[in-house]
Amino acid sequence: AYAASAAARMKYTYALQPNRGELTDRNGIVMAQTQPAVLVFVDPRMISRNGVDERVTMTREQQEKAAAAPKAVAKILATRLGGQPEDYRKAVTATDAKGKLSRYSVVRHHVDSYTFDLIKKDMKQGGWYGVFSSNDPIRTYPSGQVASNVVGFVNAEGKGAGGFEYSHNKQLAGVPGKESYEASTWGRIPLGSNTLVPAVDGTSYTLTLDAQLQLMAQQALGTAIKNAKAKSGEIVMMDVTNGEVLAMASMPTFDSNKPGKAKENQTRNRVIQDAYEPGSVQKVLTMAALTDQGIITPDSHIVVPRALSSGGGKITDAEPHGTEYLTARGVLVHSSNIGTALFARKLDKATMVSYLKAFGLGAPTRIGLPGEASGQIPKPTMPDYTRDQVAFGQGLSVTALQEAAAVAGIVNGGVYHSPTIIKSAVDGHGEPSEIPKTTTRRVISQRASEEVRDMMENVVSTAKGRPIPDYRMGAKTGTAQRIDPECHCYHGYISSFIAVAPIEKPRILTYVVINQPTNGHTGTAVAQPAARQLMSVALPRYGVQPSTDKARKEPLEYQP
């Protein structure tokens, strides 16, 4: 019994911390990494005897030295770690559950190795004992604010507390190990009972993000918000051929290295967390459903009156006009609410809802980032006036990521790819790790995709100053009334611009959304410059061949 209690008394166990997985962009630029550091801890029982074995009777000189040890050790810790000696007295005199001096008391996390070497040097020079260290790496974000709303951050304990760091914390964290051994106040007992369970490092991820494009997107977004005197905004850039997200920018933003200084509105990933009425960009989805059903072609005719009765109210267009005779192409180019609603009335409500669902609206994209909103779409039993509203982008809500992924699936030949942020992963042993599979489904025909691209190209080719050099581009503007969550009424605007290129074989999509602009409010004025700038950089960056044909200009009106 005595031997057992002595063994328990001298048993010493501490955790071995794994290295957290690294995050890099698609080109290997480090977004989040772990740097070597140590956890400083003390053995209060060892300090109380200043290293003299408990089985040895101390001399008077040793007793005097031991009595001074807690104060001396606290002073060394304060000198090297900052603060006052009193701040460390609790740690160096800590007791266990039985009220006895503890064998293990944490002093400070994330201390750099150089500082701990200075502590060891001071302890040795003074002839003091009882301060130790174990692996306790520091999480750093070399890119700072770049993609911080996506990458996220860790808390003081090193656990993911925001963004990808939070949603993939378990995989990134790895599995702690532990080491147990028998020790006296002099240290390990050489032939004692020793066990070692090694830590397993966390999984490292290569993201689909392009850090340089992400930086440009954040800069372009910041400029757009400043010029529009807006509250906030977001940009998402995608490769339409596979659903990979190349940039995901939110403003205002923060520095992942300093999450404690960030406000809640700065840490939001607006691209996935903010749901809003998309406005006229939604007309692309409406036209896609109509063309896929064979109800219209780009040349279909529609008589557009100056106003349209709907549910006891009237639908009007942004610019007042008399009776117009537009093609479907002209309806999209002029962004006619009336023309879109009239066409949509030829579409069965249940069919409309099935297309909205196929396009990925009304449900999270499951991109693997926290706080993703679902948005809302109406039921097939919606009243007629709701169908009118939904056709031109009111009466439903989406996230920027949902809307971007939907348009990507329309223009790429008609195949929806669930958006993804993960390119590849490697586990703690250096072996490839399985990543979530993206879902793909055909949503419209190849023919319908070509017809929608025809209409979107004319939005650009018939406007002044909007094309990008060397590439044919398709686009759609959006200007939606903003629903104020406080009064549940319309207040202010959400202005947007979505662009895809090259239109003959789309590769890159850019969607810019500006919230509550006060200096201009149309998507063309507020959001288009940022989209144009980013597209002109991204296309050559990804080796996309310039267009060989000139942009087409097709009839927007017809003679009755």
How would you label these PLM feature ranges?
Residues A1, N27-F116, P198-G202, K346, ...:
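Peptidoglycan glycan-strand catalytic modules in the bacterial/periplasmic cell-wall system
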Residues A1-T13, V197:
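Aromatic-capped interface at the extracytoplasmic side
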Residues R9-P36:
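Short extracytoplasmic
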Residues M10, A15-P18, K229-G233, P419:
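Short, small/polar residue-rich loop motifs at catalytic or cofactor-binding pockets
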Residues A32, A183-N194, D239-S280, L285-Q516, ...:
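Beta-lactam-recognizing serine transpeptidase/beta-lactamase-like catalytic domain environment
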Residues K71, K75, T79, H109, ...:
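Solvent-exposed, polar/charged alpha-helical surfaces in well-ordered, non-transmembrane soluble domains
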Residues A72-R80, Y88-D201, V512, P529:
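Small/polar-residue-rich segments within soluble enzyme cores
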Residues I189-G233:
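Conserved, well-ordered alpha-helix/loop/beta-strand core segments that scaffold catalytic motifs
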